[in-house]
Amino acid sequence: MTTVTPGLRLRFLGFFGPQKPPATVTFGTGLNVIYGASNTGKSFIVEAIDFMLGGKPPLRDIPERVGYDLVLLGLETLDGKSFTLWRSIDGGGFRLYEDLHQTPPTNEIPYTQLDEKHSDKNNTNLSSFLLDLCSLGGCHERCNSDPHPTPEIRSRG
């Protein structure tokens, strides 16, 4: 029997635009520290990670963001499976690609469309995907000692 190690780690965060050079942050295994002088983008990186994990748009408008139109986030499970999330900088749904794509995948590469909002009736959404990676898909939280059904766990929305 194969055991699954639940959990995931970030591998990279990248911004892409038609007339702009890629702006990418790469994450290593273990603890990553984002540091630097004031007004160098540290908080924006954290906000962008939140945005790519289902945070509501819009992503904060900063001058350095002008010209970029899409964001990629590379994820890896603790078992070594890799995925790339694609999202418009304006928000909306996600594209889920297998493997890590450090540049925007071409139209020939297959992907799964994921909704931005959680739904217990349809599991093709980002929240369900992330919860499944952590072995929490379909779980419900226990709010109190009431034996009646409880709300479904969701990562966002």
What is each model feature region?
Residues G91-R156:
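Glycine-rich phosphate-binding loops of NTPases
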Residues G30, R156-G157:
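A generic secondary-structure signal marking the coil-to-beta-strand transition
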Residues M1-R87, G93-D99:
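Extreme N-terminal "head/tail" segments of very large remodeling/mechanoenzyme assemblies
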